[in-house]
């Protein structure tokens, strides 16, 4: 049984990302004092996988289709029950009661992200989640930033700044989920404190690799990058992929499955009808590593440490390729997972949404305008009370 310290407040963070694999959850304890209120301690973690049927339905909702409103509403209810199951596991594992938790910060599942049109949609049913758990729920974190002229993404760099910045060296945090994004954490400024210089989505993370291995082997992902490691990068295909205009756009910018999907990949592959599937997988890994390395070389040439979180941190082949890609760009830099800094790579995003829930609870801004492009700091989220 966990003893709840009266000097801390408990929040749950729930995250399901563009990989569409399941829900990662953490039970986090935050100190109540102002100086250390960002220093989260993970008391428990849980993972609830999506069924193949739910993944298919979420995938179809990424693009326009028939009867979308009803299908999305039903999926939202299913996601809420999955989230509730994750919360139940966290409470059991932490030895805590629902009434000891201040709030749940839940991201939901992105099915549309159109900041250029002024909206984003993360499907879930936070009202149902509050009813099922008896805990206040804070959701819809991205819309407020978009309303203020921002991209609504990435939001996690604000958390990266709070927990990973170092006063004497520039660090880059790389989150490799379905999409990859970077947070550049500058060394201490003359005025004191660390400045997050910039953060943005670099392009595909695991999304294209996962898609290709699913199409060819029926697997959800390439374990340890073993299939890619057995292939050879196709230079002309890599160049064709790198010609995507998104990569040349200046930040702030964000992307997702709206751009990097099966049709995008098929269009690139149509230029090269003769190819080995393993070679394509190796090329897609090189695409992820190259676009991350290009972004770091351009925006953080003084980087001293690159730390990686998300599912990509568990792919040794991809980690190796990233290190090589950085070296080819003249960056002799240490590449580690966030485990080296005390947080498991698969916990970072869920912890970030527990932190964002805490920020909402304290009525503090959760976005970084330098990252998202919003006109100013904004309090993110909407409250769904349990009572």
Which residues does each PLM region occupy?
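Phosphate-binding/catalytic loop of phosphoryl-transfer enzymes
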Residues: 4-10, 115-120, 127, 135-219, ...
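Glycine-rich phosphate-binding/hydrolytic loop that grips phosphoryl groups
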Residues: 20, 149, 282, 286, ...
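Phosphate/ATP-binding catalytic cores across multiple sugar-kinase/actin-like superfamilies
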Residues: 82-90, 277-302
């Amino acid at each position: 049984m966990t003893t709840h310290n009266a000097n801390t407040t408990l929040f749950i963070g729930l995250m399901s990302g563009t990989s569409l694999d399941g829900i990662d959850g953490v039970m986090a304890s935050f100190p109540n004092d102002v100086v250390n209120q960002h220093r989260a301690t993970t008391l428990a973690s849980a993972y609830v996988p999506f069924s193949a049927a739910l993944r298919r339905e979420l995938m179809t909702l990424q693009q326009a289709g028939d009867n979308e409103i009803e299908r999305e509403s039903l999926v939202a209810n299913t996601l809420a029950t999955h989230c509730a199951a994750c919360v139940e596991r966290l409470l059991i594992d932490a030895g805590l009661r629902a009434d000891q938790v201040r709030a749940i910060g839940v991201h939901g599942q992105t099915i549309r992200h159109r900041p250029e049109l002024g909206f984003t949609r993360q499907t879930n049913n936070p009202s149902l989640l509050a009813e099922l758990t008896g805990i206040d729920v804070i959701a819809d974190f991205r819309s407020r930033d978009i309303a203020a002229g921002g991209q609504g993404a990435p939001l996690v760099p604000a958390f990266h700044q709070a927990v990973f910045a170092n006063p004497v060296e520039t660090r880059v945090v790389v989150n490799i989920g379905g999409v990859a994004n970077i947070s550049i954490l500058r060394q201490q400024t003359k005025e004191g404190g660390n400045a997050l210089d910039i953060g943005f989505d670099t392009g595909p993370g695991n999304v294209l690799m996962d898609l290709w291995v699913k199409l060819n082997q029926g697997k959800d992902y390439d374990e340890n990058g073993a299939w890619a490691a057995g292939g050879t990068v196709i230079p002309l295909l890599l160049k064709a992929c790198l010609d995507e205009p998104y990569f040349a756009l200046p930040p702030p910018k964000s992307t997702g499955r709206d751009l990097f999907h099966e049709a995008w990949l098929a269009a690139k592959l149509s230029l090269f009808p003769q190819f080995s599937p393993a070679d394509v997988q190796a090329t897609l890994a090189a695409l992820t590593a190259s676009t991350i390395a290009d972004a770091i070389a351009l925006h953080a040439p003084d980087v001293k440490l690159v730390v990686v979180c998300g599912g990509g941190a568990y792919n040794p082949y991809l980690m190796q390729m990233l290190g090589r890609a950085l070296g080819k760009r003249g960056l002799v830099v240490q590449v580690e997972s966030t485990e080296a800094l005390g947080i498991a790579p698969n916990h970072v995003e869920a912890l970030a949404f527990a932190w964002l829930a805490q920020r909402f609870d304290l009525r503090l801004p959760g976005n970084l305008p330098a990252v998202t492009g919003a006109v100013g700091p904004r309090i993110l989220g909407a409250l769904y009370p349990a009572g």
